[in-house]
């Protein structure tokens, strides 16, 4: 039932003016990813966009400066995902380093509080003595929460990156690159990126006011926070535009050099990752899921505590706790995915084809895992998916994932305009969104969402594609080129890791684990023998000893085991010939 994907090759921008000394392969890869000048390849901090272009930031730093001087109790209110956890930890660490002692944090519980700065969360902050609230990775849609804080006499600074609605909360300051009047060129900052920029601006303001001289302290080196910026940016799957690549590269470089938080070191250890060989993908696929597991199944305060702690021994205990939660999350997800596939089969049988947009619900699904489920089903069937779980009060909480061609938040906004009583609330981005609705309205939502996707989305976009960077020559299938590609990143969302295609003789094939296909192949036109592995293969099709030749979509990789390094390929797709 899994959709067969079609191969398409990228086209390079022939007008790109890239450095003449770049290797031809890198010129091709960069040009096909929209890089047009050497400036976009800058990875040093001097290439970062200036904080001065973020609207609202001047007002925010002045409020914070006054709070610092007066000893105001500041509560940072975060979010329960990896971006929210890193944003929270960065803000607390940053303000402490800048000289603020009266600061704490609060992370809403996914199951008890829901998302964002709600009135109930404001009451919790008030109970902890809040005199100023700073939101990180949330707040842009928290109208009621901000209004409630105002009635309690608590000013609010909102820092967020989610798309704003037609109206903004009545906060004392709002920093969000996606505000309509914000001139900051990068609209892809993660929440942790926005928080980092606020710390940069605050340090400058404090220096100009003589804050550090008065206290006879040196201004802190905020680059020490870039490990958190890299982790949150990659884990939140925001596009790695030029500015985010700088932030991520700088953070990766610090982690590789061992200059990172004990909590990140502990996450690296528990996930068996060598810091010196760390890639951006490791942040997204190894560290991020473990950190996210706290917010999905338990309480993200555990994750924030891990990132804040200064003791490696304590960090190892917390990382082990997160690892156990992540294993539980995987088990829950596997069961939910099996149930989702049964629902898809029923939908397919009832209408002979799957709807263009899938909305699915099961009364036993876990609301902390529906986002991952939606992502998995989207990948399998290449169409927008929203998965729902019961919230326990007669309502459902849904998490959506989209494909190129359908802006998920805009689609929900259109549904809200057409059917104002259908949803309770919604929010998000182009590729991901969250929402809630009354349980008895699910079937109506399922129908309306499917109709809207059918109306909005070109059917051709429902055909899954593998987008390749073309073939490699035999000479390019080498350790040197694999290392060149590893060093040419960071690769990530909207700046994908190089993927190549070619025809190979299939010399050996066997299953390892339960669902991974280990192969040895040789290029049809001649070249080196290559070990390869395809993860999560369809075991109803593979291994197939009757297949002698295959077309592969693959990544060059360096396999490191017990101190030995060897070339291998990671297979994304395999087609028998």
From Swiss-Prot:
Lineage: superkingdom: Bacteria
Chain ranges passing through the membrane: none
EC class: hydrolase
One Pfam family cited in the UniProt record for this chain: DHH
One annotated GO biological process: DNA recombination
NCBIfam families: PRK11070.1, recJ
Protein family (similarity comment): Belongs to the RecJ family.
Keywords recorded for this protein, A-Z: Exonuclease, Hydrolase, Nuclease
One of the record's GO molecular function terms: nucleic acid binding
EC number: 3.1.-.-
Task of the protein: Single-stranded-DNA-specific exonuclease. Required for many types of recombinational events, although the stringency of the requirement for RecJ appears to vary with the type of recombinational event monitored and the other recombination gene products which are available.
Gene3D superfamilies: 3.10.310.30, 3.90.1640.30
Classification via InterPro entries: DDH_dom, DHH_sf, DHHA1_dom, RecJ, RecJ_OB, SSDNA_exonuclease_RecJ
Protein name: Single-stranded-DNA-specific exonuclease RecJ
């Amino acid at each position: 039932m899994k959709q067969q994907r079609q191969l398409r090759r990228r086209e390079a921008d022939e007008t790109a003016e890239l450095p003449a000394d770049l290797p031809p392969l890198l010129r091709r890869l960069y040009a096909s990813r929209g890089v047009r000048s050497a400036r976009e390849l800058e990875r040093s901090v001097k290439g970062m966009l200036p904080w001065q272009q973020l609207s609202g930031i001047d007002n925010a730093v002045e409020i914070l400066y006054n709070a610092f001087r007066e000893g105001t109790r500041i509560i940072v209110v975060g979010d329960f995902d990896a971006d929210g956890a890193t944003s929270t930890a960065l803000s607390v660490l940053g303000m402490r380093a800048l000289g603020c002692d009266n600061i704490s944090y609060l992370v809403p519980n996914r199951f008890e509080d829901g998302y964002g700065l709600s009135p109930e969360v404001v009451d919790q902050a008030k109970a902890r003595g809040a005199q100023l609230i700073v939101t990180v990775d949330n707040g842009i849609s928290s109208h009621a929460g901000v209004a409630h804080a105002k009635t309690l006499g608590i000013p609010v600074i909102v820092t967020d990156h989610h798309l704003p609605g037609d109206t903004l909360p009545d906060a004392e300051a709002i920093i969000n690159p996606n505000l309509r009047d914000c001139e900051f060129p990068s609209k892809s900052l993660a929440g942790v990126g926005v928080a980092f920029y606020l710390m940069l601006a605050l340090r400058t303001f404090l220096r100009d006011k003589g804050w550090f001289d008065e206290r006879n302290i040196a201004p802190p080196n905020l680059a020490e926070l870039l490990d958190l910026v890299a982790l949150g940016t990659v884990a939140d799957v925001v596009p790695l535009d030029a500015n985010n690549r700088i932030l991520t590269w700088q953070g990766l470089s610090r982690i590789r050099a061992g200059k990172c938080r004990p909590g990140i070191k502990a996450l690296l250890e528990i996930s068996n990752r060598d810091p010196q060989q760390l890639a951006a993908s490791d942040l997204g696929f190894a560290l991020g899921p473990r950190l996210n597991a706290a917010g999905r199944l338990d309480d993200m305060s555990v994750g924030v505590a891990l990132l804040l702690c200064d003791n490696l021994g304590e960090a190892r205990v917390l990382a082990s706790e997160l690892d156990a939660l992540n294993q539980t999350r995987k088990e829950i997800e596997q069961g939910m995915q099996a149930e989702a596939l049964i629902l898809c089969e029923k939908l397919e049988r009832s209408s002979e084809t799957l709807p263009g947009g899938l909305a699915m619900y099961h009364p036993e699904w876990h609301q902390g895992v529906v986002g991952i489920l939606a992502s998995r089903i989207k990948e399998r069937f290449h169409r927008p998916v929203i998965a729902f779980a019961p919230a326990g009060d007669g309502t459902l909480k849904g998490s959506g994932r989209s494909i190129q061609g359908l802006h998920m938040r805009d689609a929900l906004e259109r549904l809200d305009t057409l059917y104002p009583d259908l949803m309770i609330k919604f929010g998000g981005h182009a590729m991901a969104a969250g929402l809630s609705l009354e349980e008895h309205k699910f079937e109506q939502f399922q129908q309306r969402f499917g109709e809207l996707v059918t109306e909005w989305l070109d059917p051709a976009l429902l055909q899954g594609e593998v987008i390749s960077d073309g073939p490699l020559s035999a000479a390019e299938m080498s350790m040197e080129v694999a290392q060149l590609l590893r060093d040419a990143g960071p690769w990530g969302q909207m700046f994908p890791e190089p993927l190549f295609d070619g025809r190979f003789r299939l010399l050996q094939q066997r299953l390892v684990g339960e669902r991974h296909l280990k192969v040895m192949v040789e290029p049809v036109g001649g070249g080196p023998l290559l070990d390869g592995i395809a993860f999560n293969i369809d075991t109803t099709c593979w291994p197939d000893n009757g297949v002698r030749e295959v077309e592969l979509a693959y990544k060059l990789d360096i396999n490191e085991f017990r101190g030995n390094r060897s070339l291998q390929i990671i297979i994304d797709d395999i087609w028998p010939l």
